[in-house]
Amino acid sequence: MNNPIPSNLKSEAKKAAKILREFTEITSRNGPDKIIPAHVIAKAKGLAILSVIKAGFLVTARGGSGIVVARLPDGKWSAPSAIGIAGLGGGFEIGIEVSDLVIILNYDRAVEAFAKGGNLTLGGNLTVAVGPLGRNLEGNVALRNSAAVFTYCKSRGLFAGVSLEGSCLIERKETNRKFYCQDIRAYDILFGDTPRPAQAEDLYEILDSFTEKYENEGQRINARKAAREQRKSSAKELPAKPLSRPLQSSAPVQLNSGSQSNRNEYKLYPGLSSYHERVGNLNQPIEVTALYSFEGQQPGDLNFQAGDRITVISKTDSHFDWWEGKLRGQTGIFPANYVTMN
């Protein structure tokens, strides 16, 4: 666990980067279902990261230190403001425990309440809930929209639920004054033109990586959705295949060509009537072009892709029927309404 004793803002920013990394990276202790989802941080309006010590004997007291940053209108993160946390709780607890805490401020009003007043009491008008874990929980809209504040607590390396109702985030004015070398309020740090300090660059690298992860994941999801929609659209556009199939012959039957040729070709499907006048003419074979791709579903079907040119061996007068053709040395039947005459 990290040191909860208040220190200078440079040390607090370094500690915050370390804590956030421990809450978001997959390790032997933290599996994919035990990390803060990237979309939670990428969509947050503000973020408070602290180390907290809790001591109890009949009544528990909580105190600690950390920083808070806010999301600026351009999507970047503000300079950090030093904060403390304090609170009392009931319950029969004896002992001392040090925990790391990440508080997600989901709405602008939560950030503004702290920035304008210098203090923010969790609970009351700002509902608090234990935040979701794992990488696939963004679809839980009810959970995402129900709480103004998400909390994450890790004690002894393990995530644990924590009640922060009644706890107060407190502006550490003197720490901010020493770091920024001027009297400056939290509001001016979080919403003003205060540049991001180089001392907190590690923290910003981690925060910016979540936006990148979220955007990349969003692009992958959108690509998968588009592919599914394309497949659905293509499936809807495919014409219905003929219902009845010709019966396959148990023995080959020679195809009557109707010409002087000594062709030694055999008709696979004697039940399929032939158009002998043109089909049997070697000088002018009938060719059709595939309008759609067809993947055979039974032995003897002729596979082809849209754009393939198929030589017709035998056909009927109907396009809503099965014809026989040859493509790349393979012979088989195919739905005639998947092709067009050349």
Swiss-Prot record:
The keyword Heme does not apply. GO terms for biological process: regulation of ruffle assembly. Disulfide bonds: none annotated. GO terms for cellular component: ruffle membrane. Residues 246-263 have a biased composition (Polar residues). CDD domains: SH3_SH3YL1_like (cd11841), SYLF_SH3YL1_like (cd11525). Residues 218-264 are annotated as: Disordered. Keywords: SH3 domain. Residues 283-342 form the SH3 domain. Residues 226-239 have a biased composition (Basic and acidic residues). The keyword Oxidoreductase does not apply. Pfam families: SH3_9, Ysc84. One of its GO terms (molecular function) is phosphatidylinositol binding. Interacts with SH3D19. Belongs to the SH3YL1 family. This is SH3 domain-containing YSC84-like protein 1. It comes from Pongo abelii.
